[in-house]
Swiss-Prot record:
Family named by the database record: Belongs to the ThiI family.
Stretches assigned to the THUMP domain: 61-165
Stored Gene3D superfamilies: 3.30.2130.30, HUPs, Rhodanese-like domain
Entries under PROSITE patterns matching the protein: RHODANESE_3, THUMP
SUPFAM superfamilies given in the database record: Adenine nucleotide alpha hydrolases-like, Rhodanese/Cell cycle control phosphatase, THUMP domain-like
Annotated ranges, domain Rhodanese: 404-482
Function (record text): Catalyzes the ATP-dependent transfer of a sulfur to tRNA to produce 4-thiouridine in position 8 of tRNAs, which functions as a near-UV photosensor. Also catalyzes the transfer of sulfur to the sulfur carrier protein ThiS, forming ThiS-thiocarboxylate. This is a step in the synthesis of thiazole, in the thiamine biosynthesis pathway. The sulfur is donated as persulfide by IscS.
Residue positions of the active site: 456
Keywords: ATP-binding, Cytoplasm, Disulfide bond, Nucleotide-binding, Redox-active center, RNA-binding, Thiamine biosynthesis, Transferase, tRNA-binding
Protein name: tRNA sulfurtransferase
Protein's cellular compartments: Cytoplasm
Entry's EC annotation: 2.8.1.4
Gene Ontology process terms (BP): thiamine biosynthetic process; thiamine diphosphate biosynthetic process; thiazole biosynthetic process; tRNA 4-thiouridine biosynthesis
């Protein structure tokens, strides 16, 4: 079988040296992706296209599908090579190949020609089209919007019958631009922004700020692995996880409520910038869209940018949520995003939409930056190729209850502000406040002869924290969902 790979049009207008470099990188990417299906396949570079030849016919569907997901490819033609002697011979072979497909249909013939022949493309279109019209009584020619387009390619003394055409995702080949680090949360925005930079030729590494224990990290790892495996498996990338709970705890205790959101984002940018510098990455990528939430006003985005000298790319800055979700659906990350947890521990009750630099710097003056340095130094760096095996491990399920016994203790793990706004008052049971960001350090000090039921408003943070405690060896925890 043979595939003709047509280049993304922007590649074809580059200078000769740049064009050749892009084609070489794309050829290598194609070979890296497809070798898992057929190690004997051949990838041949040409000035205006790339040929892929494979021997195993059983792999035709998966190879064709994989090609549609490699950045840099405009479309793919599945072709059958044949010899020809003259223009009439071309017609005879086309009639043989297309007769059944054209019966009762409108059609047109489109020809692309390379090399030296004694006819031009229009000659072939007229001759073959007229012949098909005469020999297939139920078919008729229609040059605009036909039901079937008969595509032929002629190169020197070879005729290529186009059996199928598939659209690619376009863009530049991965690796033609420099590396970036995507701040991924597993939601709609960060997945789409990562995809858009991959499609623009960047090798995208992933940085995840963990606020919810191992269960949340496993979910985000799955999203990152899916994006890499689907659109950029030709290149090795990193997945870096940073335990950010200590940072959140410090912010909740030391920073004024209205400034928390901007300060948290600035801390994330600082941490990600250190990671980027460590691995020689040129820019950060976020899924922020102008005005979507309080921290994403122009004023606040500018202050967030000022936290670091590292370039921050925001490919979704002018996109609305509906369009972002549509793209997530198209690339296959929608289901991941819909099930990704949103935490009950809201970082700020009354966030500012127009932060003042002096005020932010004053609040950050109360922050212990040694905590930020520590979590960055302890960041976990994983080769994304190993994630597939790791995520197959089952996350231990924690028991959820709607009722309690008198000898059990309800742990209200919401933030202090949430507890003040909506106090949890229950009769015949002890209710003990212990914010989620203190659980990892203070749960071990509690009376371990008792069973603790973790409570938060939506039940997501409580479940993830219970999973984390189970992983640490504590078996006396459940989730309370009244």
């Amino acid at each position: 079988m043979k595939f003709i790979i047509k280049l993304f049009p922007e590649i074809t207008i580059k200078s000769q040296s740049v064009r050749l470099r892009f084609i070489k990188i794309l050829s290598t990417s194609i070979r890296n992706v497809l070798k898992q299906y057929d190690e004997t396949l051949a990838v041949v570079r040409h000035w205006d296209h790339i040929e892929v030849r494979a021997k195993d016919e059983n792999q035709r569907p998966v190879i064709a599908d994989a090609l549609t997901r490699i950045p840099g490819i405009h479309h793919i033609l599945e072709v059958e090579d044949r010899d020809y002697t003259d223009i009439h011979h071309i017609f005879e072979q086309t009639l043989e190949a297309y007769r059944e497909q054209l019966e009762g249909k409108t059609f047109c013939v489109r020809v692309k020609r390379r090399g030296k022949q004694d006819f031009n493309s229009q000659d072939v279109e007229r001759y073959v089209g007229g012949g098909l019209n005469q020999h297939i009584e139920s078919a008729r020619v229609k040059l605009s919007h036909p039901q079937v387009t008969v595509n032929l390619e002629i190169e020197n003394d070879k005729l290529m019958l186009v059996k199928a055409r598939r659209e690619g995702i376009g863009g530049y080949p991965v690796g033609t631009q420099e590396d970036v680090l995507s701040l991924i949360s597993g939601g709609f925005d960060s997945g789409v922004s990562s995809y858009m930079l991959m499609r623009r030729g960047c090798r995208v590494h992933y940085c995840f700020f963990n606020l919810g224990g191992a269960a949340h990290e496993i979910g985000v790892r799955q999203v990152a692995h899916y994006l890499w495996n689907r659109f950029a498996s030709s290149h090795k990338v990193r997945f870096i996880a940073i335990d950010f709970e200590p940072v959140v705890g410090e912010i909740l205790e030391k920073v004024e409520d209205g400034q928390m959101g901007v300060v948290l984002k600035r801390m994330m940018v600082r941490a990600a910038s250190q990671i980027a510098e460590r691995y020689g990455v040129q820019a950060l990528v976020t899924g922020e869209a102008l005005g979507q939430v309080s921290s994403q006003t122009l004023t606040n985005l500018r202050l967030i940018d000022n936290a670091s000298d590292t370039l921050i790319l925001r490919p979704l800055i002018s996109h609305d949520k509906e369009h972002i979700i549509k793209v997530a659906r198209e690339i296959g990350t929608e289901d991941f995003a819909k099930t990704m947890p949103e935490y009950c521990g809201v970082i700020s009750k009354s966030p500012t939409v127009k932060a003042i630099k002096a005020k932010i710097e004053e609040e950050e003056g109360h922050f212990d930056f040694s905590i930020l340095d520590r979590v960055v130094s302890e960041a976990k760096n994983v080769d994304i190729r190993t994630i597939a095996e790791q995520t197959q491990e089952q996350v231990t399920e924690v028991e959820t209850v709607a009722e309690f016994d008198a000898d059990q203790v309800i742990l209200d793990i919401r933030s202090n502000d949430e507890q003040e706004d909506k106090p949890l008052k229950l009769d015949q049971v002890e209710v003990k406040p212990l914010p989620f960001y203190k659980l990892s350090t203070q749960f071990g000090d509690l009376d371990q002869s008792k069973t603790y039921l973790l409570y938060c408003e939506r039940g997501v943070m409580s479940r993830l924290q219970a999973l984390y405690l189970l992983e640490q060896g504590f078996t006396n925890v459940k989730v309370y969902r009244p």
